[in-house]
Amino acid sequence: MAKVTPFLMFSDQLEAAIEFYVATFPDSEVRALARTGEDGPVRSAEFVVGGQLFLGYNGGSYFSFSEGVSLYVDCADQEEVDEYWDKLVAAGATPTQCGWIKDPFGLTWQIVPRRFTELIGDSDPKKVKAVMDAMMTMVKLDVAALERAYDEA
């Protein structure tokens, strides 16, 4: 059976991105790097982030990421949301809205507490709407505020 592996095309910052991702997320490692020449920049790589295998390539300045593709980080709780969010911001990431943040390499991440997914899975549409409305006002997701919106609906 064929296996699907995300292939990330960076303009020229593949090695720096991999170093950051491996240092930031557990269960991460560099598996292979291919350089342009013996001491040249990394051309391609195989790496694991959070247990997920990725392939990467430095493809030149005409390649860039968009929000059309993002990496979703399923966080156990608010503490984990804060940990990853803070690491991304400290590295120069740009927070956007609704738990989304663009890293310094242009890749967009969704840092989402598992509780959010549980709350929007409720069978009561009023509660789901209240949680979604609250989420739409947030930059970094806040579990306590989401639960408050749910409880007050």
Q: Could you say what each language-model-derived stretch is?
A:
Residues 6-8, 71:
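A structural signal for short, well-ordered beta-strand segments
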Residues 61-62, 115-118:
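A short acidic/small-residue loop/turn micro-motif
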Residues 6, 21, 47, 88, ...:
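Terminal peptide-recognition signature
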Residues 24, 29, 53-55, 107-115:
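Active-site-proximal beta-strands of protease catalytic cores
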Residues 14, 71-108, 112-115, 122, ...:
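Vicinal oxygen chelate
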Residues 8-52:
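Core segments of cupin and vicinal oxygen chelate
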Residues 18, 44, 48-50, 57, ...:
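Serine endopeptidase catalytic core focused on the charge-relay Asp
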Residues 127-153:
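Acidic/histidine-enriched, glycine/proline-rich intrinsically disordered or flexible terminal extensions
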